[in-house]
Amino acid sequence: MAREDLIEVEAKVKEILPNTKFIVELDNGHTVVAHVSGKIRIHNIRILPGDKVTVELSPYDLSRGRITYRKK
């Protein structure tokens, strides 16, 4: 069930942090700490530096996000 107020943006993975967190750079140049969504975790999709991903941001805290899709 998707939430209506989320902001979806494209980003590029810059760095991998512990506990499946990533530093991603948005298309507009901002940097965000993002974690992996449950579906990506269940299906063991590997995310590496340089990958293009889709990130969901909450309008309340724009410094954190959730990676929901990895581009091929």
From Swiss-Prot:
SUPFAM superfamilies: Nucleic acid-binding proteins. Gene3D superfamilies: Nucleic acid-binding proteins. InterPro entries: NA-bd_OB-fold, RNA-binding_domain_S1_IF1, S1_domain, TIF_IF1. Its main location: cytoplasm. Keywords: Cytoplasm, Initiation factor, Protein biosynthesis, RNA-binding, rRNA-binding. One of its GO terms (molecular function) is translation initiation factor activity. It is found in: Cytoplasm. PROSITE patterns: S1_IF1_TYPE. One of its GO terms (cellular component) is cytosol. Component of the 30S ribosomal translation pre-initiation complex which assembles on the 30S ribosome in the order IF-2 and IF-3, IF-1 and N-formylmethionyl-tRNA(fMet); mRNA recruitment can occur at any time during PIC assembly. One of the essential components for the initiation of protein synthesis. Stabilizes the binding of IF-2 and IF-3 on the 30S subunit to which N-formylmethionyl-tRNA(fMet) subsequently binds. Helps modulate mRNA selection, yielding the 30S pre-initiation complex (PIC). Upon addition of the 50S ribosomal subunit IF-1, IF-2 and IF-3 are released leaving the mature 70S translation initiation complex. Belongs to the IF-1 family. This is Translation initiation factor IF-1. It comes from Acholeplasma laidlawii (strain PG-8A).
